[in-house]
Amino acid sequence: MTHPTELPLSPLSALQFYATAPYPCSYLDGRIARSQVATPSHLINSDIYTELVKAGFRRSGVFTYRPYCDGCRACVPVRVPVGAFTPSRTQRRMWKRHRALVATVSPLHYDEEHYALYMRYQSARHAGGGMDRDSRDQYEQFLLQSRINSRLVEFRDLDAPAGEPGKLRMVSMIDILGDGLSSVYTFFEPDDQHTSYGTYNILWQIEQAKSLGLPYVYLGYWIRESPKMAYKANFHPLEGLLDGRWKVLDPDRVELPPVDAALARAPLPGGHSGSG
């Protein structure tokens, strides 16, 4: 099976690409997913990863992949062109509400307080999804392993007793690419009411990209049918990778290839269904 997006020959010619076996889609119930994986991982440096991201790839730890599903093209890679971005009135309110948070940028590292917040977040937001049972090793493999230029950003309250850090509210992992920032993963305090940490985090990344002279913030995949991904459509303008080209995306009007239900919902090998 071939995809409409063709990989450039250089600097990716040293890599090999293979398709995974089918597995249950984690975004759309009842769908079957596959990924295309770039290997070997030790050859994927920041320059090569930049080219891979522009071709629709993402990473989880040192695992670099993009959707490669039979009969489904629901996952659309998206990015925000920071020079053209204009925050909405709601986003300006969110920025003002959380602007007192103090952001500290550091290399990837393990911190017990971060891990505890991650587990609270998973238990509250994604209970039963598997990640709410992640061990420390799984957490580190997922978020703290990287062979590229990655950073950990923690957001804390400004007010704290003298000599003590403010309360931890949010942690974000980002990759610094040749042409932008790539948002890897963000988790935050789930018990805080009337907050918009996720949106604030993207606004913060947009401001950081501007200050670094980088033109884009890559947000991963937007999926029209997935409520988890709906927030990405609130950033305007938004560009999507469609038919191998980045173009301005109108989430309400974009025409995506129809899903081949017979393929997208085919049973997994061994008689397992794609639901879950």
UniProtKB/Swiss-Prot annotation:
Subcellular compartments: Cytoplasm
Enzyme category, top tier: transferase
One annotated GO molecular function: arginyl-tRNA--protein transferase activity
UniProt xrefs under Pfam families: ATE_C, ATE_N
Superkingdom of the source species: Bacteria
Function: Functions in the N-end rule pathway of protein degradation where it conjugates Leu from its aminoacyl-tRNA to the N-termini of proteins containing an N-terminal aspartate or glutamate.
Name by which UniProt lists this protein: Aspartate/glutamate leucyltransferase
Lineage, uppermost ranks: Bacteria, Pseudomonadati, Pseudomonadota, Betaproteobacteria, Burkholderiales
